[in-house]
Regions:
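Adenine-nucleotide phosphate-binding core of ATP-dependent small-molecule kinases
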Residues: 190-235
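General beta-strand structural signal in soluble alpha/beta enzymes
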Residues: 5, 48-50, 98-104, 122-123, ...
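N-terminal glycine/serine-rich phosphate-binding loop of ATP-dependent small-molecule kinases
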Residues: 1-65, 94-95
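Glycine-rich phosphate-binding loop plus the immediately following alpha-helix
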Residues: 110-140, 157-207
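Short beta-strand-loop/turn "lid" adjacent to the catalytic site in phosphate-handling enzymes
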Residues: 43-118
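Glycine-rich phosphate-binding loops at beta-strand->alpha-helix junctions
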Residues: 231-249
Length: 290
């Protein structure tokens, strides 16, 4: 049995591919490795793929026992700090169960160097989404994950080309890029940069009747930007907002759009765990270090 663990913005999702469960990040502060018996007896778990925060401290899929500082440069940065993800990671590591840590995409990643104009491109769970989607749609794919924040990735010939991170381009419902007003509030000492990021989504910046339309427009723009680099790529949407924005994104892009549910990342991570622990040396262009 192989398990994928999605460290999402609002919840932790656990999947074996056949069974799954989720807990809030607050509930995750009480997690123990024994909770995995909801998916499988512990002695039948052959491998786990774990995500933690931004994953910017490692460039490769790495044995959890070899990862320092949970695979991050710092816990500071853009996002909520609750403690649930830390608890899950530490419990898995202490359990002795075979596990690998999935990296995020950053300047140390083997992506198109032009994307490295920004320090960070995507957090680790997005790799799970891309892996799951590529199984269905092939080796040339654009995937936009639209929920609390919006992140879009491009796969070309089976290798990750690059991604637009949550704080760079399209807003999500809660989080987004910092605009001039946000920068001014920060400079006046009225807000931290992280708090500004956490309140830059459409739920904070747009009237209710324009929120879905706005997210759809920006999601389509991110996808269109990626299609400049790979015009023949298939397009998919994931995340909690995917069903709501899909019709408009399809209309704006004039192409078919495949929609995935909230379990896409965890299922893809379970698939990564299976492939890594059965001998894969490369996942979407990311090396595997055992």
């Amino acid at each position: 049995m192989f398990i994928g663990i999605d460290h999402g913005t609002t919840a932790m999702r656990f999947s074996s591919g056949d069974a799954e469960f989720k807990i809030s990040r607050e509930e995750a502060r009480q997690f123990s490795a024994g909770d995995l018996t909801r998916l499988s007896p512990l002695d039948e778990i052959e491998g786990i793929a774990v995500c933690y925060s931004m994953g910017d401290g490692i460039p490769a899929i790495t044995d959890i026992r070899k990862v320092l500082d949970r695979g991050v440069v710092s816990r500071e940065g853009a996002g909520k700090h609750i403690g649930g993800g830390t608890r899950v990671y530490d419990e898995i590591r202490a359990s002795g169960l075979p596990a690998v840590v999935i990296p995020g995409l950053h300047r140390g990643s083997p992506t198109d160097p032009r994307f490295k104009a920004y320090s960070h491109q995507a957090s680790p769970e997005k790799i799970g989404i891309l892996y799951e989607v590529s199984r269905d749609l092939g080796d040339d794919v654009v995937v936009c994950d639209a929920s609390s924040n919006t992140v879009t990735l491009l796969l070309t010939a089976g290798r990750i080309t690059g991604a637009f991170d949550a704080c760079v381009f399209a807003p999500g419902t809660q989080h987004g890029a910092l605009d001039v007003d946000a920068i001014r509030r920060i400079d006046r000492g009225e807000s931290t940069a992280n708090d500004a990021f956490l309140h830059a989504g459409v739920d904070h910046t747009m009237p209710p009747d324009l929120r879905v339309e706005t997210m759809a427009m920006f999601a389509a723009m991110e996808c269109a930007s990626m299609l400049l680099l790979n015009p023949g790529a298939n397009v998919a949407l994931a995340g909690s907002m995917a069903p709501a924005i899909a019709p408009r994104v399809k209309e704006l892009l004039s192409c078919d759009v495949t929609v995935y549910d909230e379990w896409c990342a965890a299922r893809g991570l379970a698939r990564i765990a299976r492939d890594v622990f059965t001998g894969a040396t490369d996942i979407l262009g990311l090396a595997v270090e055992r």
